[in-house]
Amino acid sequence: MKFKDLRDFVQQLEQRGELKRIQMPISPVLEMTEICDRTLRNKGPALLFENPTGFDIPVLGNLFGTPERVAFGMGAESVSELREIGKLLAFLKEPEPPKGLKDAWSKLPIFRKIIAMAPKVVKDAVCQEVVIEGEDVDLAMLPVQTCWPGDVGPLITWGLTVTKGPNKDRQNLGIYRQQVIGRNKVIMRWLSHRGGALDFREWCEKHPGKPFPVSVALGADPATILGAVTPVPDSLSEYAFAGLLRGNRTELVKCRGNDLQVPATAEIILEGVIHPGEMADEGPYGDHTGYYNEVDSFPVFTVERITHRIKPIYHSTYTGRPPDEPAILGVALNEVFVPILQKQFPEITDFYLPPEGCSYRMAIVTMKKSYPGHAKRVMLGVWSFLRQFMYTKFVIVTDDDINARDWNDVIWAITTRMDPKRDTVMIDNTPIDYLDFASPVSGLGSKMGLDATHKWPGETTREWGRVIVKDEAVTARVDAIWKELGID
């Protein structure tokens, strides 16, 4: 199933019984969070709050509240189908030379399809049906959520931020939270290693003192939103990837006040600039860790223009202790990561990011071990291969007889196959999530790897234990008579 825009996706969800319209007035201050949180924990539907208290614009929440809806938004009918998307990205990340003419012909359709999915620029777009400029710009028109009691104020959460560095041919898409601090000002919380921050830094170096153009798309189609959080290879733009997911080219339109191109079917567009040197203290806000983050200083984005569709929808979410939408996204995108990792490390049989680990802070890897030290090579590879795992604090590696998604199995492997001193790898002074207050220095901390595999000669001098395995014939015999025994 393909979706041309967010409204089409909402309509399809409603037809499948996956969307609930809430007509009762509900406040964006705390109340929507409470309702969305309860719904998500019960694996419930997406929610369209049609009458937010004090606003005319409806709020769409819990959109990606189940892994199945994430998969549906990426054009797949099941979560397992996301492995095929991962295989495509793995191929594009490191394409293998054709083994012959027949192999070259077989791969040609893939490259043709990618070339055909280059974004299409249009002159007229529904995201610019209404234009608000100058003194008329007022972010108070948007029903921006205040999610938690200790939050300092309203927070834009699903904004797709579009930037372009002076030395780059392609735009960058990133999702950064934005604290509303005035009629036309928000704080752009992008970390120093993220694409938007890097573009801004390069701009300041090349154009010192000049304002940096920025645009933010709210309510883009699901393929474009999810493309921005997927490990797309550098050779492929997020817009082209979204086109592959959607099955047709992503339509873009040039902004009214700058040269940036934004999704033409988005609900709301914020256009403006960041003035170099204009900073403000951001936070505190409740975050995906389950804690309020520290206050820190980030650039201020001045909104000069708001364009939107007629009767727009405001897409929002909250973050808190898992499960929340980022954790659910992590569960679904986990299936995309597996083939990408397996392309680099074929010995990996499964990879799992438990949602309890705040989406990415812990990874469990199962593998076919072939030599002493093999598990350590794999854990170091996980930390270094994809930038998405730069902040993963704990990597547990087990043999392939362990189910990575079953804590009973994983804990059994840790407690029976590990010597704490020999099999623990500690790495100090590594990049850590700035929201991780447990690290001694902001943004810099340690990582731990646990080798919970069977040990080979060279790793131990002792005879290694044999796993107890039941007799298959006896198991079959008891299966056959089990009902007659009347035990349960």
Swiss-Prot record:
Main location: membrane
Coiled-coil ranges per UniProt: none
Residues that bind Mn(2+): N172, E238
A single Gene Ontology CC term: cytosol
Cofactor: prenylated FMN; Mn(2+)
Record-linked Gene3D superfamilies: Single helix bin (1.20.5.570), UbiD C-terminal domain-like (3.40.1670.10)
NCBIfam families named among the record's database cross-references: PRK10922.1, UbiD family decarboxylase
Name recorded for this polypeptide: 3-octaprenyl-4-hydroxybenzoate carboxy-lyase
Natural source organism: Pseudomonas fluorescens (strain SBW25)
Lineage: Bacteria, Pseudomonadati, Pseudomonadota, Gammaproteobacteria, Pseudomonadales
Gene name, Swiss-Prot/TrEMBL: ubiD
